[in-house]
């Protein structure tokens, strides 16, 4: 053992040295600093636009639908669960980084377009010209960071859709605060209620849908072995996100230019639901179908890579079957919670997640996927050691694993 390196009994770590792990910690600290600075910037931006009372009311309205949509998104994350800190990071990027950057670039682009096209034409076309490019790029950058810096977690299409949708959800939440603040200032609670139904209810999944397309492309790139597809998939996903965004924003702009007069009630109950049916629902169906295909591939990885682990004793036969049966796994976790409380539930969940992580770590090695040296992920043997430790702890607690 090299001098100064701490002893980690019973756990085999990758070959990365202290400097590798130092780089990882430095990157995490830098990311935390970015979130902190952009959070302050976003709060200052909102604080200069609206009084505190308006921010509180509109902030509550913008936050209300978030748990519902987050639950729908996380429902897609079935078999190979993503770490909570990365899910939160994706959401925060959309909420404080992408919105802050997009606000100022969109504002600058609108000024330029006004000077070139005139106020009427620019007002109608700017949301369809600049917003899709600026916003999908600022949101998509979070997915690029995850793709390159979290290779051990960003494994496939399902992961890409989940991370992308959470980035979009964070973006939509803060964007809604701005829109809600404007209409609340002008029209009070009646105006806020109107826009809440339009943006948070009828079209609340639009931004998650857009960025989910980018994530799906990157996720497919991660799992394919074809060089052409690996390069083409992210580009297709990114352009699909921008195209859908442009169509969504451009519909209203074209109606404005055409001179068609639409009443607020028609806009709320006909136009927006109609746009959702035409643009949103088919695209969401496609993403869900991609996710379902991704589930099947995840099941194959788990079953193929853990077959020999049953013989080794790392995974029991019953656990092997549980890992690809979400209903039964949930039932066992509920039983652990009812009999042994949060500690037993957490320990059993940890066992199941480590077993699945072992399967995907083996799959990465089989595909020749190289992880960054600073990414302190356990080796295959390290996962086996850790699983044995957790199993012993569960046995000592009297928790049945299956």
Which positions does each model-derived feature cover?
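Hydrophobic alpha-helical segments at protein termini of multi-pass membrane proteins
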Residues: 1-402
């Amino acid at each position: 053992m090299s001098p100064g390196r701490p002893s980690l009994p019973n756990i085999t770590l990758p070959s990365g040295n202290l400097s590798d792990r130092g780089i990882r910690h430095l990157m995490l600290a830098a990311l935390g600093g970015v979130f902190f600075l952009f959070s302050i910037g976003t709060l200052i931006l909102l604080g200069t636009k609206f009084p505190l009372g308006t921010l509180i009311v509109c902030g509550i309205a913008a936050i209300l639908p978030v748990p519902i949509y987050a639950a729908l998104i996380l429902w897609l994350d079935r078999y190979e669960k993503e770490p909570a800190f990365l899910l939160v990071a994706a959401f925060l990027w959309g909420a404080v980084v992408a919105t802050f950057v997009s606000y100022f670039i969109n504002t600058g682009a609108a000024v330029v377009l006004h000077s070139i096209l005139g106020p009427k034409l620019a007002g109608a076309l700017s949301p369809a010209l600049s917003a899709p490019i600026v916003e999908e790029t600022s949101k998509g950058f979070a997915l690029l960071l995850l793709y390159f810096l979290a290779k051990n977690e960003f494994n496939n299409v399902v992961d890409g859709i989940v991370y992308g949708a959470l980035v979009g959800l964070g973006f939509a939440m803060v964007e809604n605060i701005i829109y809600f603040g404007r209409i609340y200032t002008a029209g009070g609670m009646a105006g806020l209620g109107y826009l809440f139904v339009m943006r948070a209810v009828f079209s609340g999944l639009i931004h998650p849908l857009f960025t989910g397309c980018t994530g799906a492309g990157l996720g497919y790139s991660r799992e394919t072995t074809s060089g052409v597809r690996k390069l083409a998939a992210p580009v297709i996903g990114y352009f699909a996100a921008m195209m859908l965004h442009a169509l969504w924003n451009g519909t209203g702009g074209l109606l404005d230019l055409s001179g068609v007069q639409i009443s607020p009630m028609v806009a709320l109950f006909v136009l927006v639901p109609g746009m959702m049916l035409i643009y949103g629902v088919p695209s969401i169906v496609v993403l869900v179908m991609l996710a379902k295909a991704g589930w099947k591939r995840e099941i194959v990885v788990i079953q193929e890579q853990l077959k020999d682990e049953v013989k080794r004793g790392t995974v029991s036969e019953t656990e092997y079957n549980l890992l690809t049966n979400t209903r039964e796994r949930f039932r066992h976790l509920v039983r652990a919670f009812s009999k042994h409380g949060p500690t037993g539930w957490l320990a059993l969940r940890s066992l199941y997640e480590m077993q699945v992580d072992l399967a995907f770590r083996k799959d990465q090695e089989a595909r020749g996927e190289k992880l960054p040296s600073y990414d302190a992920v356990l080796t295959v043997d390290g996962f086996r050691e850790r699983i044995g430790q957790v199993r012993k702890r569960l046995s000592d607690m009297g928790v049945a694993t299956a």
